[in-house]
């Protein structure tokens, strides 16, 4: 299972409210603000440590233009993936959703974790360059080509 974001939890007891589902969650991908609300921590590594006992397999916190932080609890490894730079940013509306969609699409195609994070970053980068939340890309291959052109990333 994949928990993306938007649970709408109340301040003060956010972790208590989502704790029961974290053990059934393979990929937990909150935004920085959501992770801050849930954990009370400002640093991604500290956020990851707070969430470790709750059983999610992979914690990914979206950091906007700074990229993302990922902790794979099964391997004990973490990584930070920089954002794919957007040449002409227009609006951040939908960027987090595009990141999650890109992550899910890459994982379902059998991509490794780091490659999936890079792909997700490319999808988010494409999204911030349009004036609406949808329509920035129409295919997996289009995002792959953009990622290669933008940063030489290969999948």
Model feature map: region roles:
Residues 1-49, 66-68:
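Conserved beta-alpha-beta core of the PfkB/ribokinase-like small-molecule kinase fold
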Residues 11, 44-155:
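Conserved phosphate-binding/catalytic region of the ribokinase-like
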């Amino acid at each position: 299972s994949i928990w993306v974001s938007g649970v709408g939890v109340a301040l003060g007891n956010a972790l208590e409210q989502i704790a029961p589902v974290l053990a059934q969650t393979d990929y937990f991908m909150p935004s920085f603000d959501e992770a801050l609300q849930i954990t009370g921590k400002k640093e991604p590594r500290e956020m990851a440590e707070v969430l470790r006992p709750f059983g999610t397999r992979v914690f990914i916190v979206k950091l906007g233009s700074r990229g993302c932080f990922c902790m794979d609890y099964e391997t004990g490894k973490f990584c930070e993936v920089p954002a794919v730079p957007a040449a002409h940013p227009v609006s951040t509306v939908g960027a987090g959703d595009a990141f999650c969609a890109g992550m899910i699409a890459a994982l379902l195609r059998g991509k490794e974790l780091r490659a999936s994070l890079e792909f997700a970053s490319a999808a988010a980068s494409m999204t911030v360059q349009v004036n609406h939340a949808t329509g920035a890309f129409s295919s997996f291959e289009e995002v792959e080509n953009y990622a290669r052109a933008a940063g030489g990333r290969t999948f």
